[in-house]
């Protein structure tokens, strides 16, 4: 059976590229369904940990769960990572710390603990490496992966493997990752940023134009605000 739809909660699979008629998984009732006509054909993915440094700190300090958290240096430093609560105030990576604190005075600032981040990165990339050796890490918290030819070895098409990997990481580490699946690295990178956090987005040949046309040129990897003008 062709797999065109997958439930991200229970791993139910179905053949309809539109997903279940009512939008709910027939096995568990979840609405977290990934469905696409090319779902079982695409094999290039981009994996990106969600607000990685800040998420590690929040996991280790549950009392900060709903607080704005910034990981970075002192007042003269810059923001390494801002959690999603802090981002709602306009705080972003590489922002000078004094500007970040002006935008979000109640933020909890935590100095980076790279020993801890490297350890978690190795756990995540190690789990990804169990699927295929064709991994290209871009940093501690993101990587490209090519799952071509792994369907029989890993018990399902790349989309199924990656959704199962997402669940594994969340269950084992308490951290979440977002994944973009596409025919090439360029589109996979863009896809991974479309549904964060804890997202899974598919950009195939059939929907690439419709999905990308409304987005600004700065959404393209490597295109900054200056060049985008």
Where are these regions (language model features)?
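Gly/Gly-Pro- and Ser/Thr-rich, intrinsically disordered tail segments characteristic of DNA damage-repair
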Residues: 1-229
């Amino acid at each position: 059976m062709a797999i065109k739809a997958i439930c991200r909660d229970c791993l139910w699979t179905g053949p309809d590229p539109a997903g279940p008629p009512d939008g709910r998984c027939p096995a568990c009732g979840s609405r977290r369904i990934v469905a696409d006509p090319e779902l079982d054909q695409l094999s290039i993915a981009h994996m990106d940990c969600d607000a990685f440094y800040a998420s590690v700190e929040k996991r280790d300090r549950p009392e900060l769960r709903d607080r704005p958290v910034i990981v970075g240096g002192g007042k003269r430093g810059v923001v390494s990572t801002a959690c999603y609560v802090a981002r709602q105030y306009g705080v972003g990576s590489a922002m000078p710390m004094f500007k970040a604190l002006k935008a979000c005075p109640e933020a909890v600032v935590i100095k980076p603990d790279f020993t801890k981040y490297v350890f978690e990165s190795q756990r995540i990339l190690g789990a990804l490496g169990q699927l295929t050796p064709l991994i290209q890490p871009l940093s501690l918290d993101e990587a490209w992966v090519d799952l071509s030819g792994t369907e029989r070895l890993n018990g399902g098409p790349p989309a199924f493997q990656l959704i199962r990997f997402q669940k594994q990481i969340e269950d084992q580490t308490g951290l979440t990752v977002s994944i973009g699946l596409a025919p090439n690295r360029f589109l996979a990178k863009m896809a991974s940023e479309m549904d964060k956090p804890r997202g899974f987005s598919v950009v195939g040949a059939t929907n690439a134009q419709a999905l990308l046309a409304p987005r600004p040129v700065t959404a393209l990897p490597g295109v900054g605000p200056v060049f985008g003008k």
